[in-house]
Amino acid sequence: VVRIMILPNVKDVVSIILTMKMMILCCVITVKSAGIMGLSQLDFEDLRGYAIMIKVLFICHGNICRSPMAEFVMKKLVSDANFADHFQIASAATSTEEIWNGIGNPVYPPAKAELARHGISCEGKRARQVTKADYAEYDYLIGMDSANIRNMLRIFGGDPDGKVARLLSYVGSERDISDPWYTGEFGTTYNDVLEGCTAFLRYLQQNGRIDT
């Protein structure tokens, strides 16, 4: 009689345990699925943000005059247009002439002063040399003159993705931006840089890279 009473209880206990295991398993699967869906949603939002990030590298010979002027003029233009969150903008040199013991020189004082006259700060900027890895990192690699372009192509080993351009090509000009280190015409260089950067921003808008 005792055995007859115990056996049904054991079966009931086993049945309850199995049922609980199934319920727990279902809960785990549901939670994991929800987690995966949530993660996918987050990843999608992140990827969408990265998709509209436009990476621009301005390049000149020494990275102390023209390319830093272009970098900070472009930063101001995109900030004024409320596009700053969509851009990563920097500048570099094709040479190491302004880099000593691994430390780059700051922006050349007359170039810095010209930017300051237009309310633009370049504080903290130091020269650095462009590398082959920059080709993969940036969407647009923009030189100031034809010599810059030749040196860029040498460093990158070509331009298979069509990322390299001269700044004034965006205004439809074949003209180079002269190096004010030699000309002393920092105001002229600023105007050329501003014209080129403005046209470049317009190009991005017209080609659907950023919303207008």
Predicted segment positions?
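Cys/His-coordinated zinc-binding microdomains
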Residues: 14-17, 32-35
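Short polar/charged helix/loop
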Residues: 50-212
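Short metal-binding segments enriched for Cys and/or His
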Residues: 36-40
